[in-house]
Every structure is written in C-alpha cells, then in structure tokens.
Amino acid sequence: VEDRPSRSESEHISPLLGTTTLAYLDRILKDGDMVGVTLGLTLYNIVHADYTVDKAVQCCFVPVLGGVGETYAELHANRLAEEFARKFRSDFLPFYAPALFSDAGVLQGFKKEPSVRKVFSLFERLDVVLFSIGVPQGDYSTVLRMKYIDEKILKDFSEQGAVGDIGLQYFDINGSP
C-alpha cells in the first residue's frame, strides 16, 4: 500500500510499486486466469512501469466497468485492460459501455444485450482484480478529472461519509457502501 505523497499527479506512484506489482502478477498469473481491471492513474502507472514480463500467459484481461468518454481515455478500464494484456502477451475482452448511466431504465435495457451479458458473466469467473482506491477530494479525484462525476456529486459523496472508491463504488470509513 502506498499513500499518495505530496508530489505531482504523474509521480504519485513509485516506480518500485509498479515494478513490484508487475513482478507479482508475472509470478501468480497462470494460463486460463481471468483478470478484472478497473480504471485510474495508479493502474496506468503500474502497466507503464519499467518491467518485462518473463513469459506469455494465456489469460484474459477484462474491464470490470465500462469506459467510454472524451477525456483521459488512457485511464479507462478498456484501455488499461488492453495494455495489461499486451504487457503479458495475453488476450483482452473490451467492454464498450459507459461507466455510469444517468437513467436506470437505460441501464436495465443495456444489461439485456447479449454482448453485455457475456461480459457480466465473466465477472463471476475472475481470478484476480486489479484496482486502486480513489479519494473523494477534488485535487486527487481521477473520476472527477475524467468527468465521470462533477464537483457537486463528489462533495455530496464526501458529506455522506464517503472516504474512497473502488471502481466508482464509494464506501465509508467502515468499508460500507
């Protein structure tokens, strides 16, 4: 675990954490594994760490949330899943869907689509999930910067007790949603 040091946004993750994470994955991933990938700057920095994977692994990297948008595409789950797959010389399955829906009815209809059901069915088979913990503070919030949410929503989450998020799922000090 690394707390965010007071350096620039692009330097917030140490090179050692990135290479250590990749070395760990290199050691534990095996053929047939399903690897879920979320979003964000930490995962971006990990996948771009200076580390060469020893052997190709026939696993599949799957975004665990959608990610279509106009800003910071390199931090979206689809792009990160693809980059992890490239790094490990593996496969990835894209999930071209919004990360958030403004209308619950649209979301319910979307979940009925065969291609979406296929991706959702893989979530139950995940062996590993790569995620980072976001903070609901404007200066550090990647999801705010990506325009998934606005400052008012972020402030509302904080006022309701949110201390962090994992894959856009906010939680309080006790880990409860």
Give residue ranges: language-model regions.
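Conserved phosphate- and dinucleotide-binding cores of soluble alpha/beta proteins
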Residues: 67-177
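N-terminal active-site beta-alpha-beta segment that forms phosphate/nucleotide-binding
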Residues: 1-102
